[in-house]
Amino acid sequence: MRDLWIAPAVARPVSLPSPAPAGTPRRPGRRWPVRLLVAVLLAQMAFAMVTTAVRQTPTIDEPVYVGAAAEYVHEHRLRHNPEHPPLGTLVIGVGVALADPHVDPGFAGDQGQLGRHLLYESGNDPWRLMLWARLPVIALTLSFGLVVFAFARELAGPLAGLAALALYCFSPDVIAHGSLATLDVPAAGSVLTSAWLVWRARRRPRLYVPLAGPALGAALATKMSTLPAVPVLMALAAVSVWKASAGGLRLVRAVVGAGVVALTAITVVWVAYLMVDPRLRWTPEQHVPVVHGLRGLLVRLLPFPEVYRDGMRVQFGLENRPWQGFLFGRLYDGSLWYYLPSALLVKTPLGMLALWVAGAAVVVGVRRLRPAAPYVLAAPLVLLAAAMQGARDFGTRYAVFLPLFLAVAAGCVLMVRRRWVSVGVALLVAFAAVSSARAYPYYLPYSNEAFGGPGRTREWLHDSNVDWGQDLGRLADRLRDRYPGERVWLVYKGSGVPSFYGIEASDPRRVPVQEVRGLLVVSDSAAAKASGRLAELIGGSRPVDDVGHSITVYRR
């Protein structure tokens, strides 16, 4: 069996930097500046994420995950949120367990109601509970920064690693979603980790192929949208084992390598469910649609627990709903295939965009880097293509894997040994960093300078690109400080409970238009989709204030 893994002759990949000559000791003095810069970059990212998390109220999806996490930890039941596998929620559950909230085991309600009940109706402090729930995701996000650094360093040297890490640490999307108790960044980081380990398997397949599978399994056990990456990473594992082997069994070893990745990934998914409930009890408490055709066949063939397959059916059911989107000021029904590329153009710093394009070109065009191109570019391209076919045009979080993979590619630009290239990379990294830092602490509604910055993002995009319900606490402070005693009419899009934060407001859509006088407060996502009475109310009002670039205060 050992012969199936590796042959006596192992070729060293030409794309890796040449090691130091034999007998030449590595001087520790050369390492500490790099280590110091890595620590500084991660420390500033941690500061940005923690201080952002402290001030934000629950976003739309977070109560669902926090409620499910509490249920997993305290009741060990698979009842709610089947459309997402449990591993990412269990990570959130670590923070929930440390917060030790009061949990009502007898509560009956859907997953959204469960989260709101836990946060606002059970005697818990939602500020404290949400911070604890977010901290494990923040820690994971920081650890994925080390993967970005290590991947780029192995391809193009320590300076490339630092450039890649800087782009990662200053990515507004990564900071925004890495500081929330959600699943997008944990899933994306797990795919990146698997790709990096598969790349390393070109040298040591017996060590890294068995590690790449669990990393891929962690992604699959966190978000089902990572499934398209499975054949990509299996194929790359086969290529790595093939390259590391010699002799007549190369093809057999390559097939075994791909199989090991698949088998260990499947095992991780099963283990994640068994961690919640060793008996895998599953009785759906929500409608599970019947899926026909090729999709239905693929779901039935998945080698996962029935709850996972039902979750896939729920996801396909969500894809069939009549959603609305908002892009460049236009409200539309359905979805647009070019939505995600367009949204990324708005929400990515300009310097970062330039380095992404240059990095992809260098990885493909430079001969020494070309063997690494599939490992860096294939998985994100396949995931992006799959996401572009989705029915829900809700935000760049569906493509948050791009800032991770393309940061690695961008660092590889430094493989072009020209002084002007090094200067250009430094300037573009600095430009991206300054653009990101200027948005602090409003990373969720970030847009780059070409589109007017965070204050104008609501003109181009909606939902989690701008307003995900995160600023209800800031709104309460603003109303108390600037508008005490005034009549407030509120249209809020989010999962928070306004009255908990001291906001006494009425719904202006429930009374005649002429009775709405005073302050009209509208979430920007609601304003983007306004029609009928709400559109009339906004049209007859004048904006007087802005809260977090996600809520607009009008006066009537």
Please place each PLM-identified region on the residue numbering.
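Signature aromatic-anchored transmembrane alpha helix within multi-pass, membrane-resident enzymes
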Residues: 37-40, 231, 259-262, 267, ...
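Transmembrane-helix signature of polytopic, membrane-embedded enzymes
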Residues: 34, 105-116, 148-170, 202-203, ...
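Short helix- or helix-capping micro-motifs
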Residues: 164-169, 196, 216, 220
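Perimembrane helix-loop-helix junctions
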Residues: 197-205, 229-265, 278, 360-371, ...
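Specific aromatic-rich, kink-prone transmembrane helix
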Residues: 146-151, 186-203, 215, 405-409
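Hydrophobic, aromatic-rich transmembrane alpha-helices
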Residues: 148, 343-370
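Interfacial juxtamembrane loops and adjacent helix segments
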Residues: 11-12, 74, 78-138, 281-333
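C-terminal luminal/periplasmic domains and tails of membrane-associated envelope-modifying transferases
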Residues: 2-19, 25, 451-556
